[in-house]
């Protein structure tokens, strides 16, 4: 939410708050109250506290240490439940999943998902169940990620390594996010529509700019999300017009991609891309896939498949630069297994347990979704850590599960602030399938991310080749100790300061 919108809102809220404080009394339902939380101001609730927090996920983590693993806040009239323990995460995401399985229709999400036609942001409905089934069984299968698109991953990683080799030869630094974002965008472009984003006039700059604006519009809160009566402020500040421009540009982009696939003279590809699969399914009489639904799914593919993978690679390299002993150990594993073959391919990854532990540890300490995509309750429920601390959660409550807090809880993880991949060598039972609720980087339950295999394949293969081919140093004049891990708000966890690193080509003796 922009600063000018905040000022206008606070000025308008004051007289309403005066009336509110006279007549509002907190009610108990069936003898049960809502979970505790920080006191807020009349009418606006905890809005100002959350707005001024530099990093909301860190602020909520700090608050949970005081108020507990179930904590209530309010943004205007909207109640928010923050969940910060594995036990309560399991209750919300599995045991009582049906009560918590919907999504709030935030302004940005609603507009950009074609009024909830996608799989990630759509409210719980029959439409969502059908789209989810299609994505799980047709689009994002393990076979499609690891076999059908194997050549895409390996070719694009090789292209990245070749560019970095030129950088190393010139003794230049690399902006890690730009490098990894370019890789992820190239892979997703080929997977989604069959060609690299810098081919045939698609335009690298155009696509990168659109994806950046898309991420912003999905991350930002609009005044109308929490204060509907003041929704006109979004128009006054230009946010509504900005959202409309973003939607129009993305819609035109999707339209171009789909129309290109419908051309009768389009060359056949050996591997179906995602648009091919959707068009084939759309032609079936039983299909519910409309063109707008296809576009909404493409939103999830681009938003979830580019920023998340790039961010995870940045955090992995950040952690390794800050922990040189771990860097050395994982490089020794990779180089001893691969030898002088020249590159790491997907078949090699299963023989690199320490590398895979590094990826897991990165997602524990730096989860790309520090707060899982919010859910919205569709019915009342009663939850609590024990029988003496049971609470009533009302319908239409926004629910955030804090992976940031769970991943850094000393009662769950030994030395949680230290980067120790060995913990995942000792815990072979921990995986990405959402069964161990102390570790659910991709979510859990019926809302678990369907694109797990595609994202993991990209990250593991890229990281393995980065560590196999190069040694890494900070820029000249910078020490390893100067590399920090400060974060900023966003739909995916981002570094506050860009990571610049210098590759040095490793020479086998």
From Swiss-Prot:
Entry annotated with the keyword Transferase: no
Catalytic activity reported: xanthotoxin + reduced [NADPH--hemoprotein reductase] + O2 = 5-hydroxyxanthotoxin + oxidized [NADPH--hemoprotein reductase] + H2O + 2 H(+)
Entry EC no(s): 1.14.14.-
Binding-site residues for heme, renumbered to this chain: 449
Localization in the cell: Microsome membrane
Cofactor: heme
Pathway: Secondary metabolite biosynthesis
Topology in the lipid bilayer: Single-pass membrane protein
InterPro entries: Cyt_P450, Cyt_P450_CS, Cyt_P450_E_grp-I, Cyt_P450_sf
Molecular function GO labels: heme binding; iron ion binding; monooxygenase activity; oxidoreductase activity, acting on paired donors, with incorporation or reduction of molecular oxygen
Any GO BP: coumarin biosynthetic process
GO CC list: endoplasmic reticulum; membrane
Record region (Substrate specificity): 368-373
Feature type site, description Substrate specificity: 120, 304, 308
Tagged with keyword Membrane: yes
Membrane-traversing stretches: 5-25
Keyword tags: Endoplasmic reticulum, Heme, Iron, Membrane, Metal-binding, Microsome, Monooxygenase, Oxidoreductase, Transmembrane, Transmembrane helix
Role, per record: Involved in the biosynthesis of coumarins and furanocoumarins (FCs), natural products required for defense responses against attacks by predators with potential medical and agroindustrial usages such as anticoagulant, rodenticide and artificial vanilla substitutes. Catalyzes the conversion of xanthotoxin into 5-hydroxyxanthotoxin.
Family classification: Belongs to the cytochrome P450 family.
Protein name: 5-OH-xanthotoxin synthase
Organism, as annotated: Ammi majus
Chain's gene name: CYP71AZ1
